[in-house]
């Protein structure tokens, strides 16, 4: 099935937004621009009043126009006349002092300039210097609305699935393909030199220590603007060699750091005593657990062990296999004949399962090999099959095989 690109419902079309803002600014400029002096404007107002009175006295010949249209036209004309009269009265009003006039003109220009309103936040009325700053500022408001599993780009509005994807995507929008560390301000050019941290809350910038990272990118961090960084959906881009971020984490989580340092510096005797206490507590918990809790714990332990083995290196895997071989050798040396017989039966069943898996499709065999639950289900299914011989005959065969192996071992020694 082909995977088509889905439309993003959270994407904001900034071209349409800015086009609408420019149209509103143009209309505002046309309304405030009145040609001619005050006398010509008074004549225009008088003509509008004469036309209004003549239209009310005379009966119109056009019967197609409805009463609603006429009332709407007259209300628009009356509103325009009243607005122009108010502006003329404010223009003719005397001003007491020149300082008050200058201050009033400055405030009116700032409030009525449509170009400045193009970069004004529609939510908090904050004046931004450019469109890019306005877009980033607007997404500061929308970051709380975005769900925890979506990572919104503050430039184009694209929703990404992970913090790393957002960090790589943010490098595309920068002109020099660079970005800045949110803590120390150092610049980096590749996603291999920074971490994308998703924080539960926005960091308090007053608690950030003024420490610059020591590395090849610290020299480029001098030309960074002093504006506070933007946190889209709680994402921080932090460079790997950021000493300020490490120091900030130490100051924010002192209890965890002290606990780790105490574990690291504890003596050997104290460590052995602690491990013995933990083993005793674990054994007492397992003795008192129900069968359902035991099954859940075993499944959880198997899953954790599987995930740990998927992430281990070749050296760790070699050490683990060596430990398993040593433990198996010691266990077989101390087992009783009954336990040995049960182990041989289990090994025989495992071989039968393996031979059956070899006859299956390669894809299914790989799936069964990676899924422990599927392997357990197949083993449970195999238990329903009857063995080729009875239990008594199987026991006699196994005992004879054990005696034969013991004779071979004694002859070799």
UniProtKB/Swiss-Prot annotation:
Q: Give GO MF terms, alphabetically.
A: sequence-specific double-stranded DNA binding; zinc ion binding
InterPro entries named among the record's database cross-references: Znf_C2H2_sf, Znf_C2H2_type
The reply on keyword Plastid is no
Keyword list (alphabetical) reads: Coiled coil, DNA-binding, Metal-binding, Nucleus, Repeat, Transcription, Transcription regulation, Zinc, Zinc-finger
Which parts form a coiled-coil structure per UniProt? 260-367
**Where does the record place Acidic residues bias?**
58-67
ZnF (C2H2-type) ranges? 117-141, 151-173
Spell out the GO cellular component terms annotated for this protein, sorted alphabetically and separated by semicolons: nucleus
Give the main localization category.
Answer: nucleus
Where in the cell is the protein located? Answer: Nucleus
Q: Which domain of life is it from?
A: Eukaryota
Region described as Disordered: 26-83, 279-320
What is its biological role? May be involved in transcriptional regulation.
Q: Which family does it belong to?
A: Belongs to the krueppel C2H2-type zinc-finger protein family.
Name this polypeptide is given: Zinc finger protein 821
The organism encoding this protein is: Mus musculus
């Amino acid at each position: 099935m082909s995977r088509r690109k889905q439309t993003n419902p959270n994407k904001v079309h900034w071209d349409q937004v800015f086009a609408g803002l420019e149209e509103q600014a143009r209309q505002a400029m046309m309304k405030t621009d009145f040609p001619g002096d005050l006398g010509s404007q008074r004549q225009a107002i008088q003509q509008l009043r004469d036309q209004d009175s003549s239209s009310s006295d005379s009966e119109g010949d056009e019967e197609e126009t409805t009463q609603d249209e006429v009332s709407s036209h007259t209300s628009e004309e009356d509103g325009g006349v009243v607005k122009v009269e108010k502006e003329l009265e404010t223009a003719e009003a005397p001003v007491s002092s020149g300082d008050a006039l200058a201050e009033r003109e400055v405030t009116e220009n700032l409030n009525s300039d449509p170009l400045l309103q193009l970069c004004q936040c529609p939510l908090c009325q904050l004046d931004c210097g450019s469109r890019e700053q306005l877009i980033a500022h607007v997404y500061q408001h929308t970051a709380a609305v975005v769900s925890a599993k979506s990572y919104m780009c503050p430039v184009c509005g694209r929703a990404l699935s992970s913090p790393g994807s957002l960090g790589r995507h943010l490098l595309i929008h920068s002109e020099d393909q660079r970005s800045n560390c949110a803590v120390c301000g150092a610049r980096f050019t590749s996603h291999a030199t920074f971490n994308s941290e998703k924080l539960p809350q926005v960091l308090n910038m007053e608690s950030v220590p003024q420490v610059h990272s020591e590395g090849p990118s610290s020299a480029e961090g001098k030309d960074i603007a002093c504006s506070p960084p933007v946190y889209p959906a709680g994402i921080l881009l932090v460079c790997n060699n950021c000493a300020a971020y490490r120091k900030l984490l130490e100051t924010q989580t002192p209890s965890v750091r002290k606990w780790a340092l105490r574990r690291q510096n504890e003596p050997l005797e104290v460590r052995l005593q602690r491990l013995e206490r933990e083993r005793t507590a674990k054994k007492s918990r397992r003795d008192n657990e129900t069968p359902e809790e035991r099954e859940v714990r075993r499944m959880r332990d198997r899953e954790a062990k599987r995930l740990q083995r998927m992430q281990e290196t070749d050296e760790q895997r070699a050490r683990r296999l060596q430990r398993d071989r040593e433990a198996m050798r010691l266990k077989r040396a101390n087992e009783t004949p009954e336990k040995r017989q049960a182990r041989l039966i289990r090994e025989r069943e495992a071989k039968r399962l393996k031979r059956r898996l070899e006859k299956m499709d390669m894809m299914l065999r790989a799936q069964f090999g990676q899924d422990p639950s599927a392997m357990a289900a197949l083993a449970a299914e195999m238990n329903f099959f009857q063995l080729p011989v009875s239990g008594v005959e199987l026991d006699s065969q196994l005992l004879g095989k054990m005696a034969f192996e013991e004779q071979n071992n004694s002859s070799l020694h």
